[in-house]
Every structure is written in C-alpha cells, then in structure tokens.
C-alpha cells in the first residue's frame, strides 16, 4: 500500500474554470492526487462575482471541446452538458433595405453540423459536480496564488474569507499556506498568476494586445408566452464596418447579446440616451424597440460594464517538469471564432496525450524517470500547441473583420458557395471551408491555415484562368464574326465556357 501511495503524483491545478476542471478530471482518472485552488468562491454559488463583474460572453462548444470532454471517459458528464446546449446551425445576418427589415441565414456546414450555445455556469457547474464526486480530488476556493518555487516544487496561497480583509501577522504579512506538488497546471485565465510566477523561472516570450474594441452585454427577454423572440438555432449578427451586435440563445429562451465597438463609439453612445437608441436604430435594425425596449437598452448599457478585449501569445508554455500553463493563461484569444473555450479544452486532451506517450504515468518508473518523462512531454506539448494556439489567435482576429462586414460581401459569399459545393459534390477532394475545419474537426489549427491558403490559391488560379480564357474567346469571336453573335448569345456562351473550365479544373484536382 505504501508503495502505491509513493508512486502517486500530486498535481496542483490553479483555476477552477472549465479548462482547469477538465485537467483535474484527466489527472484524477490517471491516479494523481489532485488539488484545485481557485481565487474566487465556489463558482456554483450564484453570489460568487465573476472576475470581470459580469456574465461572460456566451460560450460556443464545438467539436474540439466535445472531443476533449469525451476523452475524460465521463460519458454522463458529456451527455449532461450537451443536453443543456442549444444547437446553432448557422449565422442569421440582419439588415434593412429600403425601409424593410430582412434576415438571411448562412449555414455553417453543408452536412448540417452545428455548434452549441452553452451557458458558462452550466458547463462549469457540471464539471465541478463531477470533481466533487471524485475521491482523489480536493477543491479549495477563495485561495490566491501568491508565490511559487518551481525548482523546489512549492507554492504559497493566501486564503481569503469572503467579505473580510486578510489580517497580517506579526511580521506584517498576510498568512499563507505552503503546498508541495510534483507538477502544477496553471489554468487561471488571461491575467494568470501561475504564468506570472513561471516567468520568473522560464525565459518566456510574451506578447499581449488590447484591440480598440470594447464589449458590453445585453439581454433580449423571452416573449410574454415564454418563447424565443427570434430563431434560437442561429448566431444572430447585425454587422457594421466598425462595430457589431450579436445574439446567442440561452436555455431560458432569452438571448445573451454583445455589442462590440471602438472605445470612441462607446463614448458617443454614453453621451446621451438619444444617441444610444438612435445608433441602434440606424446600425442594428430590428433590435430596438422590436427586441429590446429603449428603456431596457439604456439601463443595460448604463449598468453593465464596458470591457476590453485582450489577446496574448507566449512561448514556452512550461518550465522543466514543474509547471505547464493552459487555456487563456497560455493563449487568450479574441471571441470571434468561438474557439477560446474549445482551444482550452483541446489543450488538456493534447497535454495528457503527450504525458501518456512519454511515459509520465509509468508506475514502474522511478520518480526521477517520471520527472524526466514529464519534462519531455511538456516540451512536446509546447512545440505542438504554441504553433496551433498562435494560429487560432490570428484566425480569431481575421474573423472579426469577416463578421463585421465580410459576411455581406459578394466575394465572401462566392468563395463560401464554391467551397461548400465542392465539399458536398466532390468529397474526394477533401475540400472544406476554413470555418468547417476549425469548428467541426480536430485538425490542428496550424494545418487549417495551410489548407485554407492552398484552397485560396487554387480558387484564385481557377478564377484567373477562367477570366483570361473567357475574355480571349470573346475577343476572338468578335474579331472573326463581329455580326454573327448578339451580346446576349455571347453572354450565354461565356457562361457555358466558364462553367466548363471550372468543372474540368476541379476534376483534374480531384484525380491528381
């Protein structure tokens, strides 16, 4: 019995959000003694105030996140979470034309796949409930990480009693508890204390950026009959060149909405109630007063905080065999691809695949051998995830431009139509939209970028070839027989010629 206990590793997880909680489940399933330390109170308690003083932007759970949860081997957990989600099969673009409101659906996927709208607290509560039932897991809320020695494998936490200021001791220091560990997983968000202390030991390249966009949360209430006011199976977007309003469905039949706009625009909106209402009428037709009353709009804008958006990259994601950082602590991304949660959960799957592959859980190995194996696993994890998380960081920035305006442009619609047609009718090509690769597969993010660029080059080549050949044929026909063909017949001929060239080109690609 003593030998079994000796071989168990002790893991300290900093942060009890979805990513940290999933990491604890993975480790507990492998026999580790797990302790989770969370700065806030019990996140299942409605009175616990989020760190940003508001509900977060509604979460989108897609294939990567679902796959990561399934690999925890907690089938009931996955089923319970998915039961409380709402599938969104595409975007619903809203606008006004000549005084009339219109909406246009854009499916995410030609095969009918959907992403899932999920409330953060629903997901987090399910994970914490699962952890509380796991005997080799201990939860410590209201504990702040104040220091760490990653060579000695020790950490110090300050215990905070809610509503009370910590009292210093005789040495004028707030009392701390000392915790020993074999390794630590830092999952404590973009302003990570674990990352901060790791950077005292590791030479970390770090890049942080605040974009000139603030966000504020709004709510579209249910109808008087308790139903959704607009389609619940879409992500609703009111696009603008410099700003955007989106709405995601919630389980209580309301919609959680977010206004993204530059700081200067927020200042203009806050200068008078009239500016706010008029701006919504001009730029987000059909929202006010149809979905949100002017009074509620003003109250929510005034009451809810106007928060910044941060993105960050860093490398490496670990130090020796002592600590590894995951989720927003390693790679906070902008929310415009709905991949922040999914990338974080995928971190855990990849991390433990690396640990398993390198023998970190080989119980027959000595403690030194396991530490060496863990160091190699952490290095492999850093090598893989840095490339991929930097990629999704860049993709998320690009998708903001697409959502604000690109969804309305003819070029975006043309490329989407061509790529979806190829995916549907010539599946042997392996052709997919970039969005499908990101949201409905587990393909590495860095590979997604390479695939999308290759497809873009092929499409550009096809378009150029088609235009050049068509113009050449028309010029030849005019030169040879200027009176024989009417402009209409030439247009019809050009269309047939264009279609024939495209079909031939893609058949060639398919069988190359």
Swiss-Prot record:
Record keywords: FAD, Flavoprotein, Membrane, Mitochondrion, Mitochondrion outer membrane, Monooxygenase, NADP, Oxidoreductase, Pyridine nucleotide biosynthesis
Catalytic activity, EC: 1.14.13.9
Cofactor(s) needed for function: FAD
One Gene Ontology MF term: kynurenine 3-monooxygenase activity
GO biological process, one term: 'de novo' NAD biosynthetic process from L-tryptophan
The keyword Methyltransferase is assigned to this record: no
Reaction it catalyzes: L-kynurenine + NADPH + O2 + H(+) = 3-hydroxy-L-kynurenine + NADP(+) + H2O
InterPro entries: FAD-bd, FAD/NAD-bd_sf, Kynurenine_monooxygenase
Location relative to the cell: Mitochondrion outer membrane
Superkingdom, natural source: Eukaryota
UniProt keyword Manganese present: no
GO CC annotation: mitochondrial outer membrane
Pathway listed: Cofactor biosynthesis; NAD(+) biosynthesis; quinolinate from L-kynurenine: step 1/3
Family: Belongs to the aromatic-ring hydroxylase family. KMO subfamily.
PANTHER family: KYNURENINE 3-MONOOXYGENASE
Function of the protein: Catalyzes the hydroxylation of L-kynurenine (L-Kyn) to form 3-hydroxy-L-kynurenine (L-3OHKyn). Required for synthesis of quinolinic acid.
Protein name: Kynurenine 3-monooxygenase
Organism from which the protein derives: Aspergillus fumigatus (strain ATCC MYA-4609 / CBS 101355 / FGSC A1100 / Af293) (Neosartorya fumigata)
Gene (name only): bna4
